[in-house]
Swiss-Prot record:
NCBIfam families: PRK00517.2-4 (NF001786), prmA (TIGR00406)
Gene Ontology CC terms, in alphabetical order: cytoplasm
Residues the entry annotates as binding S-adenosyl-L-methionine: 169, 190, 211, 256
Its job: Methylates ribosomal protein L11.
Organism: Helicobacter hepaticus (strain ATCC 51449 / 3B1)
BP GO terms, sorted: methylation
MF terms in GO: protein-lysine N-methyltransferase activity
UniProt-recorded name of the protein: Ribosomal protein L11 methyltransferase
Similarity field: Belongs to the methyltransferase superfamily. PrmA family.
Gene for this chain: prmA
Superkingdom: Bacteria
Keywords linked to the UniProt accession: Cytoplasm, Methyltransferase, S-adenosyl-L-methionine, Transferase
Length: 317
């Protein structure tokens, strides 16, 4: 066993999932994953028919089957960083102590397999391909520069903040590509990675952006620097939290956010959008399309776009 291998340990407690999870994290100092399994007789039969699964302390299959969400805990630990036998003994001791403290039966079953390490970073990078949306070519920093005559945007995907691959982001980029926003004021609500703000800067707009998520603001700042553009203002919060010096009205507002929040912000959009300005709404599932259109019936519809079950709307006052 060496650093080129790791242990994959799958543990299925009969109960007390949170307590088992806390113990495993403290014991290994490693991240864990959860896998929810189907609480069906056939699935549990597969577990117990497989000789690689071991039952400890009379693991109660009936109790596990009746739990609301049977869950397996998966931990991956470098082989040279743990004595697997010591770990299992400590886990069994923990289960015994938990049983004594709760006056309940506590058992678990487990499956252990030694696996070879995999270059997850390279595999991840290989899975992220550049994408073309309207006038824009979006690529991660490890991809080569584009040779065609597109406006290039560099985004290193992080979390779920927008990299151009999702339909809702792509439709916003396509709408912006069709517009002349040179010199116009634009507000990006829920800016996420900053991809729409960066695109708008490259189209010559004076860009203001906000997001309620602190991590999104951090990612946006990183990507702004990566692309060599400058926003007029970027703040954590919503429209109502605009900093001093921000426009009272915007020529363009773009909001790629969930439908529920779109409805909540209706009055803010109406207050902040200039007369004859353009409001782009995206992040709307097709099933909520008419609900949003009804909520914004005091706006005039300029265009709609549908892609992969998602909808984007272009509106004006």
């Amino acid at each position: 066993m060496d650093k080129q291998t790791y242990w994959e340990i799958i543990i299925h407690p009969s109960d007390f999932l949170d307590q088992f999870t806390d113990f495993i994290i403290q014991k290994t100092s490693c991240a864990i994953e959860f896998f929810d399994i189907l609480p069906t007789p056939s699935h549990f039969a597969i577990i117990y028919d497989d000789a690689s699964w071991q039952s400890v302390l009379g693991f109660d299959i009936l109790k596990a089957k009746k739990s609301k969400q049977p869950t397996q805990i998966v931990s991956r630990i470098a082989s040279n960083e743990i004595n697997i036998q010591d770990f299992l003994e400590s886990l069994q001791h923990f289960a015994l102590m938990l049983a004594q403290n709760t006056q309940d039966s506590v058992g678990f079953c487990y499956h252990i397999e030694e696996k070879f390490n995999y270059d997850w970073i390279k595999a991840y990078q290989d899975s992220i391909e550049p994408v073309q949306c309207g006038r824009f070519y979006i690529r991660p920093s490890w991809e080569q520069e584009v040779k065609e005559s597109y406006d290039e945007i560099i985004i290193n995907p992080a979390f779920a903040f927008g990299s151009g691959h999702h339909a809702s982001t792509a439709m916003c980029l396509e709408f912006l590509s069709e517009m002349n926003i040179q010199g116009k004021t634009l507000l990006d609500v829920g800016c996420g990675s900053g991809i729409l703000s960066i695109a708008s800067c490259k189209l010559g707009a004076q860009v203001y952006a906000c997001d309620t998520d602190e991590n999104a603001i951090k990612e946006c700042n990183k990507n702004i620097l990566l692309n060599g553009v400058m926003l007029n203002a970027l703040w954590q919060g919503s429209i109502a939290d605009s900093p001093m010096g921000a426009p009272q009205k915007y020529d363009v507002i773009v909001a790629n956010i969930v439908a529920f929040i779109v409805k909540v912000l209706h009055n803010d959009f109406r207050t902040k959008l200039a007369k004859n300005g353009v409001l782009i709404l995206s992040g709307i599932l097709d099933e909520y399309k008419f609900d949003i259109i009804k909520a914004f019936n005091d706006f005039d519809m300029l265009d709609t776009c549908c892609k992969d079950g998602w909808v984007a709307l272009k509106l004006t006052l």
